[in-house]
Swiss-Prot record:
Residues 163-271 form the SEA domain. The record marks R51, A52, G223, S224, L992, T993 as: Cleavage. Adhesion G protein-coupled receptor. In alveolar type II (ATII or AT2) cells, required for normal lung surfactant homeostasis. Modulation of both surfactant secretion and uptake by ATII cells is mediated by the downstream activation of GNAQ/GNA11 proteins and may be a consequence of increased cortical F-actin assembly induced by ADGRF5 activation. In the kidney, may play a role in the regulation of acid excretion into the primary urine, possibly by regulating the surface expression of V-ATPase proton pump. Disulfide bonds join C291-C348, C389-C447, C490-C543, C953-C987, C972-C989. The modification Phosphothreonine is found at T1302. This is Adhesion G protein-coupled receptor F5. Homodimer; disulfide-linked. Heterodimer of 2 chains generated by proteolytic processing; the large extracellular N-terminal fragment and the membrane-bound C-terminal fragment predominantly remain associated and non-covalently linked. Fragment generates by the processing enzyme furin remains attached to the extracellular N-terminal fragment. Interacts (via N-terminal extracellular domain) with SFTPD. The lineage of its organism: Eukaryota, Metazoa, Chordata, Craniata, Vertebrata. Changing Y1158A: Unresponsive to exogenous ligand-mediated activation; no effect on location at the plasma membrane.
Length: 1348
């Protein structure tokens, strides 16, 4: 028996040979099984054309041949599959080619049966499925879908076939008979009868359609009887074929069904293909819509929008129809320059017989999105810079173009990648293309994307070209000596740059506070300025202008020659007494410098003498001996030493004083201290007193001696140990160093280590203690940020000096320098404000004598700040809290730092020790950023005095006691926390201000009796003023017609009304400002600026209206023959009264507010300390007072000595005289008011000036009502006339007729006479300006404590 492989080979060879033989012989016997099936379905007429063609011109035809292969071994199946897959097609023959061989059907035995499966992609025909037994019917467990497998091979083809693409025609027709309900039931006999008859008729009629396959009735509905059915065909109907088929249906259907021929309706589905080109539409594209059908017709159309507007050929649209092979049709609509307005629904209609083919598509415009950096800066240094453009859109781009527009033309090299939708334009500009004159010129480069369909999208890139800066630096060599100043000027010819800085030769940046920078239109300038040079400034310095990655550098060498500073020269003696018959030695010592020897001379009177040099330890000492037997005695001699270095720079020491006395006056004598008479007090440097170590050590400080009896007694000692003194000298040099911020961390570490080693000396020596305080004060002024490690070193040093064992040294130190404790606290607060925690965890730093806690404010995550401090050794505790609302007003990333001290209370303000004082913590809380709004803080202290006394919450005010500092209770109060616990005191603090701040830059001490008195006067006076001014305006309104009958009276009352109105508004704004900065409402910066502006404006308006009144009087008396109209006078008056104040107040706020120095930090009034903006109010007011006084003198003189012919009418003279009275009284009052205001400016002025100033200003409104309004005789008469009864009128007439009745406020009344005698018959009182009496808390500490 042959092997399977041999059998397979012979079989395939047979297939191929048989195929080739078949292609050379008549084909009819071989293809018969295949074409018989075709003949049965489609009719004989379809086969004949093929045969005619084959027998005629031998035109190439395609045949499908079914070959059946049988074999016994199932494993052959995979071998056949593999062999067929490896064949290469086509297989060429002499007269025919085999195009493809595909396996379609596989039958395998299953018991006694044969199961036939379709290969993937093939299926049994519907006819076979309906009339054959499927595998699932044989065994439901077999895999595969229904009808993918048949039981038994069909007796006569076809086998499995490729699935046909059917066209389903949905139709309906009406039967003109009555509808019966059984037609809804698919299992009823009536339904089956109708379905069978109709399908038979439909099949007979529609089988004439090309590619007909089946027809099925799907439903019967009402409307007579409406028959719904579907016809399945493989090709589109030909025109007119449906009508013919419908006629055949009518003919083949029983007439009893009464089918209505005109009721045939139909709509096909899935037969129209709609294409949009391009897929993504950009604005400007030419868009083509294609509608393709599988049939041919001439009835096509296009429409747009929901209203189905018909589209015709035009400039915008083009419609074109194409027939392909006479079997399909494509209609195209082209839309030119598609815009956003063209977007919407588009549809095509193709009509064939009773069918309407069509589809709809919505078209949208996609914006062209181009990514590019819109601004670039390019330095003309010949380095390539790339401009990049990329489109986010996936599109068929035809090109990417670059264009430029600008004053200068700099071309680049474009490179585009259309597949990635990106383009790069590389610029390489050099100095010749952008000279210095064109530096900063901007050129617009445009990248434009062009699609294959016409759309264009562009993006502009603004490129600013900057020339490389040419730097010019100070030419002259810089050679200075220590202590001298120098500056280096660096000029750039380019004004565009990103950064300017200075470097040392080691690459260390110099702190910006040492240099300035100014930018000009055509360049820039930076100046390095050093006020006090040290040896650390010796070296090379680089001026660097950076623009992007381009650097322009200029260098300058600086030579600093050593020269001792005056403060570094140690002298002996400072002052001394000596015998006339003895020689006396003078000594000047400086730190020994190996590289420099000074020429030193001693100067006595007008003579100079060379010095002798001696090195003692680390010091170089220069001495001179004054010879004995001077001609005159006693005599006072002043001696100083003069140092000259190699650069011929010199410095002289302070004078050493020697008093020559006879021997008989000497009672005290010591070889080191010297001689002296009783009561003599002298100072010696500790270095030369022999009280500290060896003479060569750099010991600081002084010792004071007093001659008592025959012995020198040491009165006080303020010596500084050598290590601490060395640190002090380094600290003084560090704050002048160019690299101070880099050196500060190392220095603070060394300071804490040295403080620990010298702990005993610091706590026992006031001098060393004072040196540490001076060091901390110096270092706290270094403008740099403090980190946690630096703060740790600072607190370690503070812990040493605040120990209880150092309290005696503190007391002695404060007796010598009373501000040292306040200075120490101030330096701690500066360090706390400079602390920057960043993202690190806030540290808790704890020592026995100081603790620190902190928090960082995060954006969007406000939380309560609450910290507690416990000092068990001191039996003290306290906590501080700031609520979430207050923290929300802080800038993000602000640091809040609280430092607590258990012993500082006993050190601060020694005068407190003389009172009953509560021993409590001192807690200082600082914020790293400026606080714009008032800040409320609450604290709780342990109460160690529960038995008696009233606790008082206080804060440290640095400005008290001539800036020595003191405890202040302003804005702090003891509150009830609801716990009823006498062991604790709950405090709330909110800084307040008082009213006298308006004119005086300084203010009375908060909480003092003077401050309270000024507050009371201000509030009462303002209340009276507001009521009086309102009453004045009401009175003027009532008597207006009676008192304004001539122009002079009219203008006078215009001025009085405006004065009263302006002062009333000013007083109201004054109260608003007081409410803001008194803390009743949060201090809003905008509200405070507004209050300051309106107070300034309306108070100035009061004075300018007063000036208007004076000038009007002057005009009426001097220019008698010139009479201006009312409208002219009013225009001038209002321009002067409101225009000038508006200009002054607007300029003031415009100039100062951008720098945030318009108003004070703690009050709503003009700034004094920073900008002297207060002068914008005081100077105009005082000038107006002087002018009005001068006018008053002239007017009174003119009235008393009238010229002939110049006398005005009686009524005019009465008005003028009344005005002179008003000016005469009002102006002196104003002058006195602001005279006292000037007095309050003087530092330490008497409290009487504050009281008088506040009294006169607060009651101005009342004075205006009395003297400016009610004292006017015409006003009195008008009021009496308006409110008198007939009886009173009769009596008044009678009294008037006999001349014995006078109004109570008339010039001749007794009361008026008293005023006339008092004021010299000059009239009424004029308007002054109220002052805020606010206490300045700008120098207040944030340290709080508790007083009892």
């Amino acid at each position: 028996m042959r092997s399977p492989r041999t059998f397979t080979f012979y079989f395939l060879l047979l297939v191929i040979c048989s195929s080739e033989a078949a292609l050379s012989t008549p084909t009819e016997p071989i293809v018969q099984p295949s074409i018989l099936q075709e003949h049965e379905l489609a009719g004989e007429e379809l086969l004949r054309p093929k045969r005619a063609a084959a027998a005629g011109d031998r035109v190439a035809e395609e045949y499908m041949v079914d070959i059946e292969i049988s074999f016994e071994n199932v494993s052959f199946l995979e071998s056949i599959r593999a062999h067929l897959n490896n064949l290469s097609f086509p297989i060429r023959g002499t007269e025919a080619d085999i195009l493809n061989i595909a396996m379609t059907t596989v039958c395998t035995p299953a018991g006694n049966d044969l199961l036939c499966f379709c290969e993937k992609g093939y299926q049994w025909s519907e006819e076979r499925c309906l009339h054959s037994l499927t595998c699932q019917d044989y065994d439901s467990a077999l895999p595969g879908g229904y009808c993918s497998c048949l039981k038994g091979l069909p007796p006569q083809g076809p086998f499995c076939q490729l699935p046909e693409a059917f066209i389903t025609l949905k139709l309906k027709v009406r039967l003109n008979i009555g509808f019966q309900e059984d037609l809804k039931n698919t299992s009823s006999a009536l339904y089956r009868s109708y379905k069978t008859d109709l399908e038979r008729a439909f099949r007979a009629g529609y089988r004439t359609l090309p590619g007909f396959r089946s027809v099925t009735v799907t439903q019967f509905t009402k409307g007579s009887v409406v028959v719904n059915y579907v016809v399945r065909v493989t090709s589109a109907p030909l025109p007119g074929s449906i009508h013919k088929a419908n006629e055949q249906v009518i003919q083949n259907l029983n007439h009893t069904y009464k089918m209505d021929y005109n009721s045939f309706q139909g709509t096909p589905s899935n037969e129209t293909k709609f294409t949009v080109i391009p897929e993504f539409i950009f604005e400007g594209d030419n868009v083509t819509l294609e509608c393709e059908t599988e049939f041919v017709t001439s009835n096509t159309s296009w429409y747009y929008g929901e209203k189905r507007s018909d589209i015709q050929n035009s400039d915008k649209y083009s419609i074109h129809t194409t027939v392909i092979n006479n079997i399909s049709l494509i209609t195209r609509l082209t839309i030119y320059n598609f815009t956003q307005h063209d977007a919407g629904m588009y549809g095509c209609n193709v009509t064939l017989d009773i069918f309407e083919y069509g589809t709809v598509r919505k078209l949208d415009v996609t914006p062209i999105r181009i990514l590019a950096k819109e601004e670039r800066k390019v330095v003309c240094d010949n380095h390539p810079i790339s401009l990049n453009c990329c489109s986010e859109n996936i599109a068929n781009w035809s090109s990417i173009e670059w264009k430029q527009e600008g004053k200068i033309s700099i071309l680049g090299n474009p490179e585009s990648d259309l597949e990635s939708s990106c383009s790069t334009y590389t610029l390489k500009a050099d100095g010749t293309q952008c000279p210095s004159g064109s530096s900063g010129t901007t050129v617009i480069y445009t990248c434009e994307f062009v699609s294959a369909y016409g759309a264009r999208g562009s993006k502009n890139i603004a490129v600013t070209f900057t020339s490389v800066a040419n730097l010019t630096i100070t030419r002259d060599p810089i050679s200075v000596s220590e202590g001298q100043s120098f500056s280096i000027t660096c000029l750039s010819d380019v004004s565009s740059f990103d950064e300017v800085y200075w470097n040392t030769s080691a690459g260390i940046k110099i702190h910006p506070r040492f240099y300035t920078m100014r930018r000009y239109q055509d360049g820039a300038e930076s100046v390095l300025m050093v006020k006090t040079s040290t040896r650390e400034w010796n070296g090379t310095y680089h001026c660097i202008f950076r623009y992007k990655n381009s650097y322009s550098i200029a260098t300058k060498d600086v030579t600093v020659h050593p020269l001792p500073l005056v403060s570094d020269i140690m002298m002996d003696p400072l002052e001394a007494s000596g015998l006339c018959t003895s020689s006396h030695q003078f000594k000047c010592c400086v730190e020994e410098d190996a590289g420099e020897e000074y020429a030193v001379t001693f100067h006595v009177d007008s003579s100079s003498f060379p010095a002798e040099r001696e090195v003692i330890g680390k010091q170089a000492c220069y001495t001179y001996s004054l010879p004995a037997n001077l001609p005159r005695c006693p005599k006072d001699i002043a001696v100083f030493c003069h140092f000259t270095n190699a650069a011929n720079s010199s410095v002289r020491s302070p004078s050493m004083k020697l008093k020559l006395i006879p021997r008989e006056n000497v009672t005290c004598q010591d070889p080191i201290i010297g001689i002296g008479d009783p009561g003599k007090v002298i100072q010696k440097l500790c270095q030369f007193s022999g009280v500290y170590g060896s003479p060569g050590q750099a010991i600081g400080g002084t010792v004071t001696y007093k001659c008592v009896g025959t012995q020198w007694k040491e009165e006080s000692r303020a010596c500084i140990s050598a290590p601490i003194n060395g640190l002090l000298q380094v600290a003084k040099a560090l704050i002048k160093s160019p690299t101070q911020d880099q050196k500060l961390p190392t220095y603070l570490r060394d300071l804490s280590v040295s403080a620990g080693k010298e702990e005993q000396d610091i706590r026992s020596s006031p001098g060393s203690l004072g040196a540490i305080i001076s060091i901390l004060d110096l270092l706290s002024t270094v403008p740099t940020q403090v980190n946690s490690e630096m703060m740790r070193d600072i607190l370690a040093t503070i812990n040493v000096i605040l120990d209880k064992s150092a309290l005696n040294s503190w007391e002695k130190l404060l007796q010598q320098q009373s501000n040292q404790s306040s200075q120490f606290l101030h330096s701690v607060e500066r360090f706390s404000q400079a602390l920057q925690l960043g993202d690190s965890t806030p540290p808790f730093l704890a020592h026995p004598n100081v603790q620190m806690k902190s928090m960082v404010i995060k954006r969007g995550h406000p939380q309560i700040y609450q910290q507690q401090f416990i000092f068990k050794d001191s039996d003290l505790w306290g906590d501080v809290a700031i609520d979430e609302c207050q923290l929300g007003n802080l800038q993000p990333d602000s640091s809040i730092v609280t430092v607590a001290f258990p012993t500082l209370k006993a050190i601060l303000a020694q005068d407190v020790q003389r009172k009953t004082s509560s021993n409590s913590l001192v807690m200082t809380t600082t914020v790293s950023h400026n606080i714009v709004k008032p800040f409320r803080i609450s604290m709780t202290f342990k109460n160690n005095h529960r038995s008696g006394g009233k606790p008082q919450c206080v804060f440290w005010n640095f400005s008290l006691a001539n800036n020595t500092g003191g405890w202040d209770s302003s804005g702090c109060s003891v509150e009830d926390d609801g716990r009823d616990n006498r062991d604790r005191v709950f405090c709330k603090c909110n800084h307040l201000t008082s009213f006298s701040i308006l004119m005086s830059p300084d203010s009375p001490d908060p909480g003092s009796l003077l401050k309270i008195l000024l507050d009371i006067i201000s509030y009462i006076g303002l209340g009276f003023s507001i009521v009086s001014l309102a009453a004045c305006l009401v009175v003027e309104a009532m008597v207006w017609k009676s008192v304004t009958k001539n122009r002079t009276s009219y203008m006078r009352h215009i001025c009085i009304v405006n004065i009263a109105f302006c002062l009333l508004i000013a007083d109201i704004w004054f109260i608003v400002a007081g409410a803001i900065h008194d803390g009743r409402y949060p201090l809003n910066e905008t509200a405070c600026v507004a209050a300051t502006f309106f107070i300034h404006f309306f108070y100035l308006s009061v004075f300018f209206w007063m000036l208007t009144l004076g000038l009007m009087l002057f005009y009426r008396l001097i220019f008698i023959l010139h009479d201006a109209s009312k409208s002219t006078q009013k225009a001038i008056a209002f321009s002067l009264g409101y225009g000038c104040p508006l200009i002054i107040s607007s300029i003031t706020v415009g100039v100062t507010q951008p720098q945030e120095v318009y108003m004070r930090k703690n009050a709503c009034w003009l700034n004094w300390e920073d900008t002297r903006a207060l002068l914008a109010f005081a100077i105009p007011a005082l000038i107006i007072v002087v002018v009005n006084v001068s006018i008053t003198v002239v007017v009174i003189t003119k009235i008393l000595r009238p010229s002939i012919g110049d006398k005005p009418g009686k009524q005019e003279k009465s008005s003028l005289f009344q005005i002179s009275k008003s000016i005469g009284v009002l102006t002196p009052l104003l002058g006195l008011t602001w005279g006292f205001g000037l007095a309050t400016v003087i530092q330490g002025s008497n409290a009487v000036f504050h009281i008088i100033f506040t009294l006169l200003n607060a009651f101005q409104g009342l004075f205006i009502l009395l003297f400016g309004c009610l004292w006017d005789q015409k006003v009195q008469e008008a009021l009496l006339h308006k409110f008198s009864l007939s009886r009173w009128s009769s009596q008044h007439s009678k009294s008037t007729s006999i001349g014995s009745s006078t109004p109570v406020f008339s010039m001749s009344s007794p009361i008026s006479r008293r005023f006339n005698n008092l004021f010299g018959k000059t009239g009424t009182y004029n308007v002054s300006t109220p002052e805020t009496t606010s206490s300045s808390l700008e120098n207040s500490s944030s340290a709080y404590s508790l007083l009892n």
